[in-house]
Each structure stands twice: as structure tokens, then as C-alpha cells.
């Protein structure tokens, strides 16, 4: 089912009795033909139930299955079960044209409203130690021991597959702090490393960085540490002397995340 919006077209496709695919294509955009690395099974076209009452459009595979209820004015979607109970409700969606190097690209964001008692699992294999990732910021990159899978499962009985091959931020940060490097050459260690070139001995250097962050109100905050390189050897982040992130091994991804409680006011950050 295609639904015309003010700046694009929304496609809602029942893939099975309990699965619905949603696509949005802005006007004037030609999408390249890319190999589908996630949805690889050939699927026959199937009939679906379509009903419109005023600005409300309901799409489902059949009357007793999962249904998507679309607000035809705003394009926002609410997913309901066969009994009409809300499973998931869309909050904000954004599609903006941009550049990736010399190529035209789209920057897409999608958010949903979740319950305070909900647990979310998924996004792949990470070293941050979190099983419930509700509210946790993660950058989904493939690097050595980190395996990113753009899918989450809820304890409420649903799942979301983000079928997008671009760099993805889960619960993206809305505030960035650039830290200043400390004086001195830093410490170094020599390690044995195994890679595609075989076993080698490497000398690795560590530097210290510091800065401050201003918190407007007390609460739990998600912190993402980005070392600015393709890989890292150490993740150490303290706030006001308290350790928030601490990982040290031969192969670390460039980012790591944690949720911590911060009181209102200024806090000192130290990273090594």
C-alpha cells in the first residue's frame, strides 16, 4: 500500500501475518539498486487488507494479524495487535538530503515511544556489558570483535529490523564534548598482536584527555566515548574521579558506551 505524503511516498507492505515492512521515499529521490543483504528470500506478492476512515489508514495481512495504522496527514504509524492493543508507536521521523564524500546521500532518523518498564535487547555483539540497551547510545560499526546487527527485540513481544546499510547511531547523542589532550608524550606498552599479516610485536601509546560538561538537570545520562580512530587499545573514562568506562585489551572498537547518573551542574571528564 502506497500513501502519498506532502514530501514523499510511504510504503506499507505486510510481509507475513506478523511482519510489516515500512519504506519512505522522498520526492525527487532515485534510490540505487542495491543488493539486499538482509531480506534475501524471494517472496510472492500477497493480498492485504486496506481500510481508510478519514485520515486513518489501516493495513494488515488479514483481519486477525498485526496491523499498521497510519495517520495520512502526518505519516506517523502505530502498530497494533489483533485485539487493537498498541504494540509500538512512532514518534519522530526525519529524512534529509546530504553528502557522503562526493556522493549524494540521505540522513534518516526514526524514533519510537517505549514504556518505562520496557527492556530492549539486540544491535549485535558489543563489549560495553549491557544486555538491556533501552536508553543506551551505541554506534553500530563492524570492527574486529564488535559485530553490529541492526535489530532489536523487546520484552513486550515485538522486534524491529533496521534494514539500512548506512552508519547507524542507536539512541544518538544530542550533545558533544571535545576533550583537550594533556601535556607530555603519554605512556606506551609493547604487545603481541595477531592479524592478517601474522604475529607481530607492536608498541602502543596512550594519551590523556580532559574537559568539562554542564548538566542542566539531574538524571541518568548515556555517555558515548569516541576515540577518533578506526580502533582503540584502551577505554578509560572518569567523571569527577568516578570510573564510568574501563576496558583495556588488544582489540577494542573506536567507541564505547555507558549509562551513568549525573547531578545538575558542572562535571570534570578525564579520558585515557
PLM regions: where:
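N-terminal accessory segment at the very beginning of proteins
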Residues: 1-189, 195-225, 230-262, 271-272
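Exposed beta-strand face motif in extracellular beta-rich ectodomains
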Residues: 265-267
Amino acid at each position: 500500500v502506497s500513501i502519498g505524503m506532502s514530501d514523499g511516498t510511504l510504503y506499507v507492505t505486510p510481509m507475513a501475518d506478523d511482519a510489516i515492512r515500512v519504506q519512505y521515499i522522498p520526492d525527487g529521490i532515485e534510490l540505487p539498486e542495491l543488493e539486499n543483504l538482509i531480506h534475501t528470500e524471494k517472496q510472492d506478492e500477497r493480498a492485504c487488507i486496506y481500510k481508510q476512515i478519514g485520515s486513518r489508514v489501516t493495513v494488515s495481512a488479514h483481519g486477525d494479524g498485526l496491523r499498521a495504522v497510519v495517520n495520512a496527514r502526518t505519516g506517523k504509524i502505530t502498530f497494533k495487535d489483533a485485539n487493537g492493543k498498541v504494540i509500538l508507536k512512532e514518534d519522530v521521523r526525519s529524512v534529509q538530503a546530504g553528502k557522503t564524500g562526493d556522493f549524494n546521500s540521505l540522513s534518516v532518523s526514526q524514533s519510537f515511544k517505549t514504556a518505562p518498564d520496557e527492556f530492549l535487547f539486540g544491535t549485535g555483539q558489543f563489549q560495553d556489558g549491557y544486555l538491556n540497551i533501552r536508553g543506551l547510545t551505541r554506534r553500530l560499526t563492524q570492527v574486529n570483535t564488535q559485530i553490529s546487527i541492526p535489530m532489536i527485540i523487546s520484552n513486550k513481544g515485538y522486534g524491529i529490523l533496521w534494514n539500512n546499510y548506512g552508519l547507524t547511531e542507536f539512541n544518538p547523542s544530542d550533545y558533544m564534548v571535545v576533550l583537550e589532550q594533556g601535556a607530555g608524550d603519554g605512556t606506551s606498552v609493547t604487545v603481541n598482536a595477531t592479524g592478517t599479516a601474522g604475529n607481530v610485536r607492536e608498541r602502543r601509546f596512550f594519551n590523556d584527555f580532559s574537559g568539562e560538561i554542564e548538566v542542566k538537570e539531574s538524571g541518568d545520562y548515556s555517555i558515548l566515548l569516541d576515540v577518533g580512530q578506526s580502533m582503540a587499545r584502551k577505554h578509560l573514562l572518569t567523571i569527577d574521579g568516578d570510573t564510568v568506562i574501563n576496558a583495556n585489551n588488544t582489540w577494542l572498537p573506536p567507541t564505547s558506551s555507558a549509562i551513568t547518573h549525573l547531578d545538575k551542574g558542572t562535571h570534570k571528564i578525564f579520558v585515557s
